[in-house]
């Protein structure tokens, strides 16, 4: 049996591919294209060459990883159907997030090719959602969900399963229960994910930049800077009311057999308050270890390989130069893992996977990070 956090794994269990940087929305809280997003500074947007994506997918297929896309908006990628087909015909699961605005146009083809799950982003009733994501977006997404459900019924297919991702911000924190219990037909969904807005303080971003400079020779951290928010912007949220809504939606999902995920997992008032106050050490869900860098490979639209969204400033290789599996077994990733065996980065609390528990391991007894 391999030890926990072993470098001996032949391939990642989870491969996440950023097909492109382009998006057709400008959601206010997005760390890529939002008000403080890092992509506004890009001179030219990147997207991966289709043949390079397919070659990387085929390289991984014998190891049967789970795949995920992200963007930008993944459904804007011209070669998405070829990539979906290669993954699904190769016997692997595929899930990806989408803003939902293109579902109606592609409902039949999505059902025909059958990605395992789509995570559709909605942030409240129409007026509230559109305040964050853009005018008319809610209606377009709802039409898409209905078209997809109709196409699934016609084909007699369960795929793609549908999930809703709801990002809690100061603008929509009062509307969580209203949306899920009265604003959407829960019978359409197999899963619900409610995530408190990811962010980092200025001090965390600076400390992260210093760590990357000192230990890895990285000169700048523009991606990390896209997460920076002042915790004061969350001070108007009614933490008691928000927590009660989260618990209510969780119970409603449990009654209907819908998978419920929250970030953080512990739905208690003080835990939620500590999150929005950047009191990370007081969080019940805090971690001092994470398994994600040992199981996940993320490929950016520029070909750069990292192990986590929050490490996009710290690539360990590029698939334009080396194969993904060579990078996975390479010295740069071993160096990163060696660092993370001793401590996490200051920016790790800005990661949804850190709070979601997908990669969490119990903290060693000898440390209290």
Predicted segment positions?
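Short beta-strand segments
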Residues: 16-18, 71, 97, 163-166, ...
């Amino acid at each position: 049996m391999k030890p926990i956090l072993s470098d001996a794994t032949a391939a990642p269990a989870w491969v996440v591919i950023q097909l492109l940087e382009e998006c057709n929305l400008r959601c206010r809280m997005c760390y890529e294209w939002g008000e403080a997003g890092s992509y506004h500074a890009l001179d030219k947007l990147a997207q991966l060459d289709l043949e390079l994506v397919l070659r990387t997918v085929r390289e991984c297929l014998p190891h049967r990883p789970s795949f995920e896309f992200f963007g930008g908006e993944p459904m804007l990628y011209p070669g998405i159907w070829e990539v979906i087909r290669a993954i699904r015909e190769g016997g692997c699961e595929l899930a990806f997030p989408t803003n939902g605005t293109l579902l109606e146009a592609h409902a039949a083809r999505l059902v025909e090719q059958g990605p395992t799950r789509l995570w559709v982003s909605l942030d409240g009733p129409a007026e509230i959602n559109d305040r964050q994501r853009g005018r008319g977006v809610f209606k377009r997404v709802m039409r898409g969900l209905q078209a997809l459900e109709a196409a699934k019924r016609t084909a007699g297919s369960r795929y793609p399963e549908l999930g809703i991702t709801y990002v809690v911000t100061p603008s929509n924190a009062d509307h969580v229960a209203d949306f899920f219990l009265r604003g959407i037909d829960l019978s359409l969904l197999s899963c619900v994910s409610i995530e408190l807005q990811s962010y980092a303080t200025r001090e965390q971003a600076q400390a992260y930049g210093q760590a990357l400079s000192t230990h890895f020779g990285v000169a700048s951290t523009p991606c990390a800077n896209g997460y920076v928010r002042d915790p004061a912007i969350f001070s108007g949220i009614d933490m008691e009311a928000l927590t009660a809504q989260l618990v209510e939606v969780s119970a409603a999902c449990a009654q209907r057999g819908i998978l419920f995920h929250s970030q953080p997992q512990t739905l208690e008032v003080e835990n939620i308050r500590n999150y929005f106050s950047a009191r990370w050490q007081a969080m019940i869900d805090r971690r001092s270890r994470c398994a994600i860098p040992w199981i996940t490979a993320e490929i950016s639209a520029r070909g750069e390989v990292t192990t986590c969204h929050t490490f996009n400033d710290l690539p360990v290789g590029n698939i334009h130069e080396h194969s993904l599996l060579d990078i996975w077994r390479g010295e740069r990733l071993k160096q990163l893992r060696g660092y993370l065996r001793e401590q996490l980065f200051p920016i790790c609390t800005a990661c949804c996977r850190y709070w979601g528990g997908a990669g969490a391991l119990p903290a060693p007894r000898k440390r209290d990070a």
